[in-house]
Amino acid sequence: MERQMEPCQLIERSIIKKYRKELWTPFIVAVKRYELVQAGDKIAVCISGGKDSMLMAKLMQELQRHSDVPFELVFLVMDPGYNEINRQKIESNAALLNIPITIFETDVFAVANNSDKSPCYLCARMRRGYLYKKAQELGCNKIALGHHFNDVIETTVMSMFYGSQLQAMPPKLHSTNFEGMELIRPLYLVREDDIKAWSCLLYTSDAADEARS
């Protein structure tokens, strides 16, 4: 008789089995092609609570589990001023996926809302700075962000039409403000539609059947 698998195990299995071609393969290609993970790295996987960062966290867990290269992971959640419902949702999804998150509070929303500058731009800048700082405090040398293939294309196209110069979103980037820190984007080759398809496993009652197929 087949042993009943837990929801988290089914979701993890789906990454390696059902969505191997769409998720696992492009993830591994990006990690190897751009040399995103090195022996001895301590990587802060930055989780916003959305589908992209949650998938990234599971992929990084699977990589650590199967890799011959030793490295450490910290799963970092910056609370910019979430309401209680949003924070609880992040915590419950992380628990479902067996992701041991570390949450730290900031005042990003409050500062951005009281600024004359674009709130979205300011939020993004402040968020990244806080993530770098906290990751460094925890002894990490890298932060991983959940930008995917479509984000990369959109950023490039937007800079062509609205920017004064062509700007790309590289797969890795050395920080100029935090010495010894590097930003990596493990989902660089993963497409948004495939992430959406996988994320349905978290919200449907047919997750077990989907993951086994």
Question: Each predicted region: which residue ranges?
Answer:
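ATP-dependent adenylation/nucleotidyltransferase module used to activate substrates
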Residues: 2-162, 170, 193-197, 201
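Generic hydrophobic alpha-helical segments
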Residues: 138, 211-212
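CoA-thioester-processing core
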Residues: 167
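Short, flexible loop segments at boundaries between secondary-structure elements
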Residues: 171-190
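Conserved small/polar residues in nucleotide/adenosyl-binding loops
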Residues: 203-211
